[in-house]
Design a protein with these regions (language model features):
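Iron-sulfur cluster-binding electron-transfer modules in prokaryotic oxidoreductases
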Residues: 1-175
C-alpha cells in the first residue's frame, strides 16, 4: 500500500474526543484482573488533569460477553446499554468513556445499528421505559479510555516526576 493510501486510512480512523465531562463505564473484566488501571485512569483525569469523570456506582456490565457467547439476546443488550445512556443523561453528561473494549465495541455497534435501523432504537426506548421508566440521549462523544489517555498524553507527560532515560547517556531506557 502506498503512503497516500495509509495516510487516508489513518485520517478516516481519527475522531474527535471531548475535552471534559466524561461518564465512565467500568469494565467487568479489567477491574477484576487490573483493578489499579481503573483507579489510575480516574485519578489521572480527575485529580491530575482536573477533568470531570463520573464513575456512577449504578453502572452495570454491558452484557457483551453474554451476547458474544449467544446467551444474551441483542434486544436485552440494547436495553442494558440504553440504561447506561440514561444514567449518563440523568447525570447531565454527554460524553461516554468505556474502560472495556468489549463495551466500546457494543456501544459503537448499537449506535450504528440505531442510526441505520431507527426502529431498533424506538423498540429499545420502549423496553427501557417499561423496565425502568427511564429515557436517554445518545452520547455526543464515545471514546475508549485509551483514546482519552492518548489525547492528553502531552499534559500527562508534562507532570512526570522522573524521566525513563539512562542517567549517563540521556537515551530512553530499553525496558
Amino acid at each position: 500500500m502506498n503512503l497516500l493510501g495509509k495516510q487516508q486510512i489513518w485520517k478516516d480512523y481519527q475522531k474527535e474526543i471531548a475535552d471534559d465531562k466524561y461518564f465512565y463505564a467500568r469494565s467487568c473484566i479489567r477491574q477484576t484482573f487490573f483493578p489499579g488501571s481503573e483507579w489510575a485512569y480516574l485519578d489521572i483525569l480527575n485529580n491530575k488533569l482536573g477533568k470531570t469523570v463520573l464513575d456512577d456506582p449504578r453502572h452495570t456490565t454491558c452484557t457483551g460477553i453474554g451476547y458474544h457467547s449467544d446467551v444474551v439476546p441483542i434486544e436485552t443488550v440494547m436495553t442494558v446499554v440504553a440504561r447506561h445512556f440514561a444514567l449518563m443523561t440523568e447525570a447531565g453528561f454527554e460524553n461516554m468513556t468505556p474502560s472495556c473494549i468489549t463495551s466500546f465495541g457494543i456501544y459503537t455497534e448499537i449506535l450504528h445499528t440505531w442510526e441505520t435501523h431507527p426502529e431498533w432504537e424506538e423498540k429499545t426506548r420502549e423496553f427501557l421505559w417499561k423496565a425502568t421508566k427511564r429515557e436517554f440521549q445518545k452520547p455526543k462523544n464515545l471514546a475508549h479510555t485509551s483514546d482519552v489517555i492518548y489525547k492528553f498524553r502531552n499534559e500527562i507527560a508534562a507532570q512526570k516526576k522522573y524521566s525513563l532515560v539512562d542517567i549517563h547517556t540521556g537515551r530512553p531506557l530499553q525496558v
